[in-house]
Amino acid sequence: MKIRVGFGYDVHALVPDRELWLGGIKIEHTLGLLGHSDADVLIHAICDALLGAANMRDIGYHFPDTAGEYKNIDSKILLRDTMRLLREAGYELGNIDATVAAERPKLNPHIPLMKKTLAEVMNVDEEDISIKATTTEKLGFTGRQEGISAYATVLIQRMGS
């Protein structure tokens, strides 16, 4: 069986007058993430991990922030397209293990809906997606509530293996 591991990371600044999207869902908060797309750091980290595992470069290569077509795009579209690229290359998802680092808002209540949403977009089982939330104990840019970051590790395998 041919299996591969990928790692992804993303970070965006928190700013006023933007919606907060994480894991494909809108979360009520006074600040949102700044970015060319909807700035969903969790989805972006997952996309990077998937592309890296398949040795297909990164999210910026496939969906450049210099392209107008991706301005304010829903990151679920990027994830769906990443899964299409992965499957076209002959891979399927084994599992995802992801962590989101944010001081606020508290994310644990939102994790079940994030998992459900991501599983639907990716056409995988919810049990194949693990999402954890943490803080940085008020340290660094995350602790000062200046931004949110996400880390994702994925396992992929050749289809039919």
Swiss-Prot record:
PROSITE patterns for the chain: ISPF (PS01350)
Obligatory cofactor(s): a divalent metal cation
GO BP terms, alphabetized: isopentenyl diphosphate biosynthetic process, methylerythritol 4-phosphate pathway; terpenoid biosynthetic process
Keywords recorded for this protein, A-Z: Isoprene biosynthesis, Lyase, Metal-binding
Matching SUPFAM superfamilies: IpsF-like
Residues spanning the signal sequence: none
GO molecular function per UniProt: 2-C-methyl-D-erythritol 2,4-cyclodiphosphate synthase activity; metal ion binding
Cofactor: how and how many bound: Binds 1 divalent metal cation per subunit.
Enzyme class at the top of the EC tree: lyase
HAMAP family in the cross-refs: IspF
Function: Involved in the biosynthesis of isopentenyl diphosphate (IPP) and dimethylallyl diphosphate (DMAPP), two major building blocks of isoprenoid compounds. Catalyzes the conversion of 4-diphosphocytidyl-2-C-methyl-D-erythritol 2-phosphate (CDP-ME2P) to 2-C-methyl-D-erythritol 2,4-cyclodiphosphate (ME-CPP) with a corresponding release of cytidine 5-monophosphate (CMP).
NCBIfam families named among the record's database cross-references: ispF
Protein name: 2-C-methyl-D-erythritol 2,4-cyclodiphosphate synthase
Origin species: Parabacteroides distasonis (strain ATCC 8503 / DSM 20701 / CIP 104284 / JCM 5825 / NCTC 11152)
Gene that this polypeptide is encoded by: ispF
